[in-house]
Amino acid sequence: MSVPRVGVLALQGDTREHLAALRECGAEPMTVRRRDELDAVDALVIPGGESTTMSHLLLDLDLLGPLRARLADGLPAYGSCAGMILLASEILDAGAAGRQALPLRAMNMTVRRNAFGSQVDSFEGDIEFAGLDDPVRAVFIRAPWVERVGDGVQVLARAAGHIVAVRQGAVLATAFHPEMTGDRRIHQLFVDIVTSAA
């Protein structure tokens, strides 16, 4: 694969920022809102947003089943914040009955929604990230954390003693928003994963 076509799930969140970051890292980015667009990509970014709303938009657009199937077939994916929540196999504090975040089950992990607190508890800080020489500036907004990782999941970063970045095969997830800082190393890591998986 010379230039990977990487979709950004364009339901909520920093779609434009992810598209720009992917372009800067040598990918061919495109938005994904429909089944034919999902079928056309080599990989997918699931941005932040509100995980319960995103789940139900996926249902309404008839994308939840097809996305689960593509992920089960090995589609490389990167989820930031709400994207991390959705990629999990289990979600704690998933939301009110009938309006819960629905796991895509792409990673063998349990994630707790809004674990770091509400909007007013949002913060940023420098964190060590496995494989990167210098710390990453991480922006946490109503962020989740990973409560448990299972077999095959590599922990890449922690903040305040909690797991905030993980990888399982060609699937990457962060509790923070690298698209907001101008530091492209996380997106470059994902593009490299996509290229290697081809």
Curated annotation (Swiss-Prot):
Coiled coil: none annotated. L-glutamine binds at residues 49-51, 113, 141-142. It comes from the Bacteria. The active site is at residues 81, 177, 179. One of its GO terms (molecular function) is amine-lyase activity. It catalyses: aldehydo-D-ribose 5-phosphate + D-glyceraldehyde 3-phosphate + L-glutamine = pyridoxal 5'-phosphate + L-glutamate + phosphate + 3 H2O + H(+); L-glutamine + H2O = L-glutamate + NH4(+). SUPFAM superfamilies: Class I glutamine amidotransferase-like. Catalyzes the hydrolysis of glutamine to glutamate and ammonia as part of the biosynthesis of pyridoxal 5'-phosphate. The resulting ammonia molecule is channeled to the active site of PdxS. Belongs to the glutaminase PdxT/SNO family. This is Pyridoxal 5'-phosphate synthase subunit PdxT.
